[in-house]
Amino acid sequence: MHTMATALTLEPTALPSDAIEVGRIADAWGLQGWFKVQPYSADPEALFSCKRWYLQPAARGAKAFGGTVLLPIRQAKDHGGMVLAWAQDIDDRNTAEALRGARIFVPRSSFPSPPPGEYYWVDLIGLQVINRQGLALGQVRELRATGAQTLLVLAHEQDGKAGKRMIPFVPAFVDQVELPQKRIIVDWQPDY
């Protein structure tokens, strides 16, 4: 049986500049070193497609490692809203438990391409939003799922004061998403 020393074989590394936090290790699963991951997305495809995860220690509790480490993934699969994963050199329950709470990052460049007309939210954050008349409405700060639709939450300035504007991210209001130009064109007015 492996001991905590196994966890120390994780390779210290720098976090890639395009790293996106995609989940956290929830707990060990079984006796063979598998562990459960709580993904931050309803579609955890990035966890399945990337075979090199970057871990950072849990914010609270015991830490089995310090700084950022590289975790090569042998296998990852869906498990009812969670992801089960098995990593290189993690071969028993104790070692898997030592990773509990670790934050998981993957490079944005390793995400699979979304279907046409679909976007990763992370790619929309920071884009400028302008209307059909060319008026700047603000910059995307976050996206909010409301059940019926997703909202673009924009930061903007009006009369020298910081403000917030929300626009439904639906085809009726969004004309174009131009990622290379870092902008979204909408059918919306500032007084809506």
Swiss-Prot record:
Query: Which keywords appear in this protein's UniProt record, sorted alphabetically?
Result: Chaperone, Cytoplasm, Ribosome biogenesis, rRNA processing
Q: Which cysteines are joined by disulfide bonds?
A: none
* Leader peptide range in chain numbering: none
InterPro entries in the cross-refs: PRC_barrel-like_sf (IPR011033), PRC_RimM (IPR056792), RimM (IPR011961), RimM_N (IPR002676), RimM_N_sf (IPR036976), Transl_B-barrel_sf (IPR009000)
What terms describe the molecular function in GO for this protein? ribosome binding
Instruction: Give start and end of each PRC barrel domain.
Output: 116-192
**Cellular component per GO?**
cytoplasm; ribosome
Q: Does the keyword Cytoplasm apply?
A: yes
Q: Superkingdom, according to UniProt?
A: Bacteria
Location(s), subcellular: Cytoplasm
Report if keyword Secreted is assigned.
no
- What is one Gene Ontology biological process annotated in the Swiss-Prot or TrEMBL record? ribosomal small subunit biogenesis
One matching Pfam family, short form?
Answer: PRC_RimM
Where mainly found?
cytoplasm
Q: What does this protein do?
A: An accessory protein needed during the final step in the assembly of 30S ribosomal subunit, possibly for assembly of the head region. Essential for efficient processing of 16S rRNA. May be needed both before and after RbfA during the maturation of 16S rRNA. It has affinity for free ribosomal 30S subunits but not for 70S ribosomes.
Q: Which PANTHER family does the entry link to?
A: RIBOSOME MATURATION FACTOR RIMM
State the similarity comment.
Answer: Belongs to the RimM family.
Q: What is known of its domains?
A: The PRC barrel domain binds ribosomal protein uS19.
Q: How does it assemble?
A: Binds ribosomal protein uS19.
Q: Which HAMAP family match?
A: Ribosome_mat_RimM
The protein's name in its UniProt record: Ribosome maturation factor RimM
Q: Which organism is it from?
A: Verminephrobacter eiseniae (strain EF01-2)
